């Protein structure tokens, strides 16, 4: 789970595949209708793709549960899934996982590394980076992690990537940076 104590600008790039997993539809809606998000719940093992209305309902349930334990609106919770296509999520395990993770949320190098490892499927090693630098007289940090970089056709198909920053940036500029 990725969480910010304050609402963050949200932007996204999504697969162009005709078949889109429920979390893609959920997150695309958040990016379209909101300037901010505050959490991302990620599961690895089952993609929640080709799961129909039940898959969409599971996105809602996941967001509702995260919102409840984190004290934020469900509309500020993105959901991401990776893994086997066509299987339903074990929603009871997802809910229990959200409950278990919330009090253990942490920041720093070790927490970032653990999160990057947790989203791996067929990856051979975690992919993460964080850089701190000065811009306009202020120190800012940009961090990122991803999985599935070997299977990205068509355009982001099975790849999950997350970028975080404390940089004050407009939604439009953030979206442009992700779309280059």
Q: Which residue ranges define each predicted feature?
A:
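Short, ordered loop/turn segments at secondary-structure junctions
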Residues: 6, 29, 45-47, 82-84
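Glycine-rich oxoanion-binding loops at beta->alpha junctions
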Residues: 14-36, 123-134
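Short, glycine/acidic-enriched capping/hinge loops at junctions between secondary-structure elements
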Residues: 10-15, 36-37, 52-55
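Short coil/turn segments at secondary-structure boundaries
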Residues: 46-57, 85-89
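N-terminal amphipathic/basic leader segments beginning at the initiator methionine
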Residues: 1-19
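Glycine-rich anion/phosphate-binding loops
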Residues: 16-25, 53-63
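Glycine- and acidic-rich phosphate- and metal-coordinating loops
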Residues: 38-45, 76-82
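Glycine-rich, mobile lid/loop segments that gate access to catalytic sites or pores
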Residues: 5, 60, 65-180
């Amino acid at each position: 789970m990725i969480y910010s104590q304050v609402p963050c600008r949200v932007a996204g790039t999504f697969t162009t595949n005709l078949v889109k997993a429920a979390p893609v539809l959920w997150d695309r809606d958040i990016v379209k209708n909101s300037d901010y998000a505050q959490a991302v719940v990620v599961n690895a093992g089952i993609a929640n793709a080709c799961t129909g209305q039940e898959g969409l309902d599971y996105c809602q349930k996941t967001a509702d549960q995260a919102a409840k334990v984190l004290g934020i609106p469900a509309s500020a919770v993105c959901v991401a899934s990776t893994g086997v296509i066509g299987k339903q999520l074990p929603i009871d395990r997802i809910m229990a996982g959200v409950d278990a993770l919330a009090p253990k949320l942490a920041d720093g190098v070790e927490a970032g590394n653990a999160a990057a490892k947790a989203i791996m499927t067929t990856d051979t090693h975690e992919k993460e980076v964080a850089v701190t630098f000065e811009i306009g007289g202020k120190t800012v940090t940009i961090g990122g992690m991803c999985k599935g970089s070997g299977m990205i056709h068509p355009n982001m198909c099975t790849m999950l990537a997350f970028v975080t920053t404390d940089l004050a940036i407009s939604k439009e500029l953030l979206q442009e940076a992700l779309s280059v």
